[in-house]
Amino acid sequence: MHTRKVKKVAILGTQGVPANYGGFETLVENIIGENCSNDIRYTVFCSAKDMPQRMKEYKGAILKYVNLRANGVQSIPYDIVSMMRCMRGYDTILILGVSGCIFLPFLRLFSRSRIIVNIDGLEHRRAKWKGWVKRFLKMSESFAIRHAHTIIADNRGIQDYVRHVYDKDAKLVTYGGDHVLVGIDKEREIEILEQYGLEPDGYCMSLCRIEPENNCHIALEAFAKSKEKLIFIGNWKANGYSRKLKEQYSGYDNIKLLDSIYDLEILHAMRKNCKCYIHGHCAGGTNPSLVEAMFFGRPILAFNIVYNRETTHHKANYYQNCKELLKLIGRVPDNGKKMSKVAHRYYTWKHVAKEYEALY
């Protein structure tokens, strides 16, 4: 009887696990552990600055630490140092994001590992990046796509972009979202709603980072002209854009602006009982918050871009401006069951974990 060889896989490019927040951190959290096959042995590179508890193992994965921050100006050296430390001893290196991929030609030169890069959501196109940062991210993306053995796109729109711009084929592996189904009882659910002054089907909901590319201003402008109630969760003190919106709209009786919430029980109760979920993102590939919302079977109103259409399999309802959104919230379409069906078929972490393992 032959035993299958255990594959050693290094994951780098995230803050690390346990996940506090962030799409890639949540991805790692859910492809290791109970969703991981017995013949895969993960090592996750973590930031010692961001993860001060410095656990040695987590959910069966080995944790190694780099003494730099994973985000901001240190993200590039953080990724490069991580790559240098995993040149030997791994069958596969999974890199999440492209910021350090200028080092990829050297990694290919000195390592025999299979290199897989998830290029995320075309970071260089985000409005928040300007000048040399934008050019650097575009160059890093180019290095990633040209030098990795396998490129992962989490959305068909990203896959089409890679084919059109680089004449390369990317593997489509989506994002999971069923970790948000925490299964709280009805009594706790009602308690949470009462805590926030909410009633089932009595409010619409949105959740995101408060940035221009997430079109928060469109949702707020629409609800300022409507009698419908909006619960909008985000980091309202993070930047000039968010602070300006908070100052402008916090006086409306039907608009409640809540600071970021990470408690899955609270989010479960809010998502499950909202009248509809509004998703304004216009950048990136598959947005985790959209996938998560789809699992609750509530109607989705999404900004009309290819990534959101692909994520929802063209079964949500879409808007391009305040006028179109105002029309939708005045008469919310019933697409919730379709959203739940798509989510349970394509966006479970068990499915996503197997898709990744097939590439190792």
What is each PLM-predicted segment?
Residues R4-K7, T14-N20, G33-N71, G157-V165:
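N-terminal strand-loop element at the rim of the active site
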Residues C276, F295-A302:
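Short hydrophobic beta-strand element within catalytic cores of glycosyltransferases
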Residues H281-C282:
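Aromatic "clamp/platform" in nucleotide-sugar-dependent glycosyltransferases that forms part
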